[in-house]
């Protein structure tokens, strides 16, 4: 019944998820333009007991993947404008995806997918709460996308709720995944209204400690469609040698005319400096979004250049999350697709109804 977040499911894969179960979450998160139909489906599942309301609860979520483990907290997070510097964005957004998600929110009044946030948890004591809860038997276990294994624990003890609140009340959080959905949730909350503590002023959130050893961020490589000459780099013999040479450095690999190079960059974050020092100079006033292709597979980037889809590929190492957080705290936004947090939390575990008449 679970599925990846709505924006990482290709249209061609929708029938596959729909065929898994008549109750797969894509029937809610990817209804096409039938937003009212998604609302009817959600209410029908409630009426038939397919979905069961919990008492006020938080949840601990664990995902195992590739021999690693990550633990998260799922809870309602108060929506606050970026200017309050509590919720920190690190990427710009586009209008189109927000219009689609806002229409779905208006129809359903339900937070259907958790937004993913990262927090600095070393001094909060929250991770200790998560560890204690996860020693119990989980309420739910299931297999998720990409071979992931998941466990879910329910926290219904008001004393633990208070402890979690105390641990996080002075913390800022970084949006890991869901910039468009967060801004949509803000717009919806303003439309619906309600007092400051009403459910409509919150969103469903999955929160991960920045120091969790299972928190993984992957690089996204770029292929430039415009004609470009890249010079001055260190020559490399292969893709593997290029990727190894940029690991842990503020540098970018390049591929053009069957030649690999490494470009040293000056600054804190390679993806920022690649755009500022190289790509922006090539494109001038032209929008990068019109001239860039993105992939997490460096070999695919090489194929695109060899096939003439693009003229040059740029390879990046995974960004340092501490630097990403620092730049977000300074109010700086990064280029599009600077981070790819992995594996993304599946949709369909927990839903949160945005009732303006219900106080939290």
Regions found by a protein language model. Give the residues of each.
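Surface-exposed, charge/polar-rich loops and edge strands
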Residues: 1-360
